[in-house]
C-alpha cells in the first residue's frame, strides 16, 4: 500500500564505546542546545510546529530523567535573541509553548521537587508568556531539587554586553575601581549569577541534530565545558541518549589547562 506520509525511523544513537556508570560522576550542571524540531517535523511531512510540540514532550522526559540522575542544574536553550527572525506564525507558536508547558507540567515539577528559573530578556516576551513564566517560578520557588533553567530570548553576546554596561555603571558610581574587576565580578553580573558559584558553569554541553556549533549560547560559562554532539534530533533525544553523553563525560580527563593526572611522558601534548 502506498504511504503518502512516510514515517522516518526513530533515531537510534550509535553504540557508545563507553558504558554509563550510574554510580560514577554525574555532571552537576548540564546545558543543552535543543536543535532539530523543525527537521524532525519535515522528515515526517508535518508542519514545523508539530516538531516544537513533540520537542516540548522531550523536555518533560529529559527534565525528570536528569533530576533522577542527580543533576543539579539543567539549562535548556529554548529561544534565542535571533529566533525572532523566524516566520511570525512559528514565533507566535513558540511564545505559546511556555504557557502550555508550564500549565501542564508544573504540578509534576512540584512533585519532582524541581525549581524553575528563566533567564533572558523577558521584558520583550508577550505578556501571556511573561505571566506563565512568573507563575511557574512562583509556584516552584520553594523546591530544593534540580534547577530547570530555561534560556528564553537569550543571547550570550547580549548577556555579556549587558554585564559590561552594569559593571561600567558601578565603576562610574565608585562601587569599585576598574582594577578591582575580576572574573568573579563578571560572573556575578551574568544571567547565571543567581546560581551558587560552583554550579554556574556547565560541566557538559550537549547539542542535538548533528550541528557542531555553539550558536551564541553561554559563551563565558562554557570556557571549560565538555562538549557532546549527537545526530539525534531533539524530539528523538531520550534518556538513553542523555546517559550516552554522560558516559562520554565520565571518560574524559578534565585538565583545565593543566597536565593529566597520570605521569606525562616526554614529547606528549602540553595542552
Curated annotation (Swiss-Prot):
CC cofactor note: Binds 2 magnesium ions per subunit.
PANTHER family in the record: DEHYDRODOLICHYL DIPHOSPHATE SYNTHASE 2, DEHYDRODOLICHYL DIPHOSPHATE SYNTHASE FAMILY MEMBER
InterPro entries assigned to the protein according to its UniProt record, in alphabetical order: UPP_synth-like, UPP_synth-like_CS, UPP_synth-like_sf
Signal peptide: none
The organism's taxonomic lineage, starting at the top: Bacteria, Bacillati, Bacillota, Bacilli, Lactobacillales
Enzyme class: transferase
Family stated for the protein in its record: Belongs to the UPP synthase family.
Protein name in the entry: Isoprenyl transferase
Record-linked HAMAP family: ISPT
GO molecular function: ditrans,polycis-undecaprenyl-diphosphate synthase [(2E,6E)-farnesyl-diphosphate specific] activity; magnesium ion binding; manganese ion binding
Active site residues per record: 35, 83
GO cellular component: cytosol
Record text on subunit structure and interactions: Homodimer.
Keywords from the named record: Magnesium, Metal-binding, Transferase
Cofactor requirements of the protein: Mg(2+)
BP-aspect Gene Ontology terms: polyprenol biosynthetic process
Amino acid at each position: 500500500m502506498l504511504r503518502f506520509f512516510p514515517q522516518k525511523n526513530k533515531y537510534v544513537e550509535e553504540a557508545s564505546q563507553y558504558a554509563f556508570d550510574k554510580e560514577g560522576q554525574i555532571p552537576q550542571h548540564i546545558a543543552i542546545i535543543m536543535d532539530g524540531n523543525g527537521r524532525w517535523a519535515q522528515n515526517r511531512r508535518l508542519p514545523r510546529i508539530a516538531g516544537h510540540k513533540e520537542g516540548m514532550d522531550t523536555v518533560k522526559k529529559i527534565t525528570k530523567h536528569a533530576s533522577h540522575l542527580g543533576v543539579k542544574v539543567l539549562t535548556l536553550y529554548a529561544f534565542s535573541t535571533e529566533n525572532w527572525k523566524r516566520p511570525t506564525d512559528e514565533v507566535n507558536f513558540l511564545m505559546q509553548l511556555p504557557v502550555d508547558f508550564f500549565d501542564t507540567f508544573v504540578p509534576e515539577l512540584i512533585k519532582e521537587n524541581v525549581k524553575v528559573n528563566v533567564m533572558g530578556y523577558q521584558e520583550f516576551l508577550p505578556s501571556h508568556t511573561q505571566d506563565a513564566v512568573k507563575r511557574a517560578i512562583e509556584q516552584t520557588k520553594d523546591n530544593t531539587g534540580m534547577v530547570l533553567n530555561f534560556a528564553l530570548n537569550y543571547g550570550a553576546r547580549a548577556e555579556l554586553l549587558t554585564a559590561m554596561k552594569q559593571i561600567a555603571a558601578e565603576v562610574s558610581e565608585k562601587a569599585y575601581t576598574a582594577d578591582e574587576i575580576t572574573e568573579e565580578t563578571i560572573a556575578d553580573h551574568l544571567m547565571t549569577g543567581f546560581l551558587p558559584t560552583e554550579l554556574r558553569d556547565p560541566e557538559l554541553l550537549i547539542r542535538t541534530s548533528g550541528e557542531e556549533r555553539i550558536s551564541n549560547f553561554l559563551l563565558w560559562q562554557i570556557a571549560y565545558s565538555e562538549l557532546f554532539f549527537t545526530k539525534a534530533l531533539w524530539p528523538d533525544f531520550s534518556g538513553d541518549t542523555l546517559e550516552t553523553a554522560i558516559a562520554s563525560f565520565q571518560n574524559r580527563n578534565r585538565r583545565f589547562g593543566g597536565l593529566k593526572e597520570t605521569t606525562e611522558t616526554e614529547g606528549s601534548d602540553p595542552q
